[in-house]
Regions:
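Short beta-strand edge/turn micro-motifs at domain boundaries
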Residues: 167, 177-202
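Residues embedded in well-ordered secondary-structure elements
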Residues: 8, 157-159, 171
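Glycine-centered tight beta-turn/hairpin loop motif at sheet-sheet or coil-to-beta transitions
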Residues: 173-175
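Flexible low-complexity loop/turn motifs enriched in small/helix-breaking residues
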Residues: 23-161
Length: 202
């Protein structure tokens, strides 16, 4: 039985990652983060999981940015862009060990890397922004500084929890909105996906 390249890569990354190993006030829509530690308590609720991850990513964004996912391009213009999949494994490992992200989040990111790499092989380039990497691949946006400056000013615009699945729509500082999808595993909530909302609707 043939296994697709994406499916095979997903199985590989799962094996690699497996081997390596606030509170909400009574107004309901105002979140207060009590601490930034990666503890079981901080990941025991949907809100704390989201804010815990955002704080973690804010504090580790520069470190993750030092992992060069792309080879080629400037200053060697004769070498086309291509993915460094050794670097991507390290990048995904660092994300996974944050303790906030589900296997689904990690696997979808890995699939995205493969799709971008396939695009670069079909349409070679050695300069300029790369389609699919011309925004922050975690925050799913180019401009998300309003999130960092408003982690203590967050409102819940929509919330739906059904057994082990959850969805929250959050607003940061009265402007930036994003949707968060989570799954509960072993009594802890993990992020499956982040989708920005530019509709302007509440």
């Amino acid at each position: 039985m043939k296994i697709s390249r994406v499916a095979l890569a997903s199985l590989v990354i799962i094996n690699i990652l497996a081997c390596s190993d606030s509170k909400t006030d009574k107004t309901y829509n105002k979140i207060v983060l009590t601490n930034k530690d990666d503890t079981l308590l901080n990941r025991a609720s949907v809100e704390k999981t989201i804010l815990g991850f955002l704080n973690w990513y804010k504090n580790n964004e520069d470190k993750l940015g030092q992992i060069n996912l792309i080879k080629g391009g400037l200053p060697e213009k004769t070498t086309n862009y291509s993915f460094d999949f050794v670097a991507t494994r390290k990048y995904l490992f660092e994300l996974k060990r944050s303790g906030y992200l589900s296997d689904s989040f990690i696997n979808n990111l890995q699939k995205h890397f493969i799709e971008v790499d396939d695009y670069l092989k079909k349409y070679p380039q050695n300069d300029g922004p790369i389609q699919g990497l011309d925004y922050d691949i975690i925050m799913k946006s180019q401009d998300y500084m309003d999130v960092w400056s408003n982690l203590d000013n967050v409102k819940i615009l929509n919330k739906d929890i059904n057994n082990d699945k959850a969805y929250l729509k959050l607003e940061f500082g009265g402007y930036y909105k994003a949707n968060y999808y989570l799954t509960k595993k072993d009594s802890l909530w993990l992020l499956d996906n982040i989708v920005n909302d530019f509709s302007g609707e509440k």
